[in-house]
Design a protein with these regions (language model features):
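Short, surface-exposed acidic
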Residues: 136-137, 167-186
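Active-site-proximal catalytic alpha-helix in oxidoreductases
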Residues: 152-155
Length: 211
């Protein structure tokens, strides 16, 4: 299956692919990635524009439970964010979210000279190995909230962020229960740390009288 937003190119690629390709005229940002299930597994490749890459991958990796493998070309800056680890200046909400569902690997850099006309920036090709379903976040809704809240103020200490967070009043208690030092900053936490915080947050919300 091929997703193409432009009607002309969708028709052209359907013609070139003939019986081997099903071209679907749609915007990848509106596609229902939950259609990719273990009973309907997919391998996905794509060349993603800058404004599409982050929101599409946020949706894809969290909803496609049957994704076998993926490879994407993106702007180098986006690739660095996807593959970055704690302590890296590129590490942020997108890094934590995608790495909670898949293992990204930076494969190689593509220079402007590979394109015509050449862009002003480098591109990067990354591969992704989806994590087994039993290793994925139990409460992705809370994980998304935690990482968005934290990385909106990435230079502040976690204790300060938690005290001033009306969206997640349980965050201070969740940090304490997860054993996270409140003087740390978001970019110092691992993916596992953020998942632990979200799990303790879930426990606090589900059992408010016991915590």
């Amino acid at each position: 299956m091929l997703l193409e937003k432009d009607s002309h190119w969708a028709a052209e690629r359907q013609r070139l692919g003939a019986a081997r390709t099903q071209a679907v005229l749609t915007d990848a940002l509106r596609f229902d990635w939950s259609r990719i299930t273990p009973d309907n597994p997919w391998k996905i490749i794509g060349n993603l524009p800058y404004n599409v890459a982050s929101p599409m991958m946020w949706d894809l990796f969290s909803r496609a439970t049957g994704l076998v493998r993926a490879a994407f070309m993106v702007q180098k800056e986006v690739g660095q964010r996807l593959a970055a680890g704690p302590g890296n200046g590129h590490y942020g909400a997108l890094s934590v979210w995608v790495q909670s569902f898949a293992r990204p690997r930076m494969e190689f850099i593509v220079g402007p000279g590979a394109f015509s006309p050449p862009p002003k920036v480098d591109s990067a090709v990354l591969s992704f190995e989806p994590l087994p379903l039993d290793q994925r976040p139990e409460r992705p809704d809370l994980l998304a909230l935690v990482i968005k809240v934290c990385f909106q103020q990435r230079r502040k200490q976690l204790g300060s962020i938690a005290r001033r967070c009306p969206l997640a009043p349980w965050l201070s208690a969740a940090l304490e229960q997860a054993g996270i030092t409140p003087t740390l900053r978001p970019e110092q936490l691992t993916v596992a740390d953020f998942q632990h915080i979200s799990l303790f947050g879930a426990s606090l919300l589900d059992n408010p009288l016991k915590n």
